[in-house]
């Protein structure tokens, strides 16, 4: 499928030199690496050593000329950090071309609703993302706010319109947030998936 772009969201822990070489060979992959602040705040949610693994992965991907950025889950606790000049400068220094921002959504057993951003923080991110993207005074990284930037992609792109999600089991889902599937990438071609009732 060389005429299709594939984008993967990853925790980056399995990215090594062999992986990067294979990505260069294939040529149609880009990546969003999970990152939720500097080492302390990131590793408190992602696990000890994750921050260092993400930094190593970025260095390797940069060395091989791959296209990558970050996927940032912002919470009440880390919002100021992940929108700070210092954090954005680190991303730029590490070769990130973009940064997706998703607000924390508590789900499942043991959910932590106290981490949801406040209404004031939700307003602030809209303003701050636009400051970062500005031609004057902005940063050399393209930032997108998943919940508030629909105007730039024509609204929701899911359901096969421009995008669908493949989970870790290979199930094709309309969206990363909608866990329904009637087809699996192991048993169906991409065209068959897009022609299945869930995507039509």
Positions of PLM-derived features:
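Short acidic, glycine/proline-enriched helix-loop-strand junctions
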Residues: 4, 50-55, 68-78, 107-142
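Active-site-adjacent beta-strand anchor residues
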Residues: 9, 35, 175, 183-184
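Flexible glycine/acidic-rich beta-alpha junction loops that bind and position SAM and/or redox cofactors
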Residues: 77-79, 98-119, 142-155, 179-182
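C-terminal accessory region of radical SAM enzymes
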Residues: 120-151, 176-200
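Short, small/polar residue-rich loop motifs at catalytic or cofactor-binding pockets
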Residues: 157-161
């Amino acid at each position: 499928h060389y005429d299709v772009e594939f984008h993967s969201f990853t925790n980056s822990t399995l990215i090594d030199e062999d992986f990067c070489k294979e990505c260069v060979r294939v040529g149609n992959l880009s990546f969003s690496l999970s990152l939720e602040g500097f080492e302390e705040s990131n590793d408190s949610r992602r696990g000890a050593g994750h921050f260092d693994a993400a930094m190593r992965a970025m260095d390797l991907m940069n060395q091989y000329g791959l296209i990558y950025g970050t996927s940032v889950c912002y919470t009440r606790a880390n919002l100021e950090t992940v929108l700070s000049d210092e954090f954005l400068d680190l991303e730029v220094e590490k070769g990130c071309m973009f940064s997706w921002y998703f607000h924390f959504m508590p789900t499942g057993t043991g959910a932590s609703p106290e981490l949801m951003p406040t209404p004031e923080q939700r307003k602030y991110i809209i303003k701050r993302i636009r400051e970062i993207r500005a031609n004057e005074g902005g940063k050399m990284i393209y930032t997108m706010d998943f919940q508030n930037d629909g105007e730039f992609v024509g609204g929701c792109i899911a359901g096969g319109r421009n995008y669908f999600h493949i989970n870790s089991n290979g199930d094709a889902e309309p969206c990363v947030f909608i866990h329904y599937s009637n087809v699996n990438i192991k048993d169906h071609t991409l065209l068959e998936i897009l022609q299945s009732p869930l995507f039509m």
